[in-house]
Amino acid sequence: MSSLDKTMYFDFDNDSVKDVHDTLTTVYEALQEKGYNPINQIVGYLLSGDPAYIPRLKDARNLIRKHQRDEIIEELVKSYLKADKDVDA
């Protein structure tokens, strides 16, 4: 079996969960304060990786860049599934 046929495994430190939550909260507040639609801007950043979607206000741009985008997406998916169903994520 070639390495391309194997499933990749991601595992993040549990301490990063709170950090990601705190970062997203700060970013959300900064975007609201600037008058942007926070959800659209965060999605734009996550899809493109372009930090221009995130303002410098409250150091939001630097904070969000401390996390890998896949780490943020993983925490968002876990949070969604826990809220939607009683899933052990």
From Swiss-Prot:
Top-level lineage group: Bacteria
Stored NCBIfam families: PRK05473.1
Alphabetical list of PANTHER family matching this protein: UPF0297 PROTEIN YRZL (PTHR40067:SF1)
Sequence similarity: Belongs to the UPF0297 family.
Protein name: UPF0297 protein lp_2275
The species this protein was found in: Lactiplantibacillus plantarum (strain ATCC BAA-793 / NCIMB 8826 / WCFS1) (Lactobacillus plantarum)
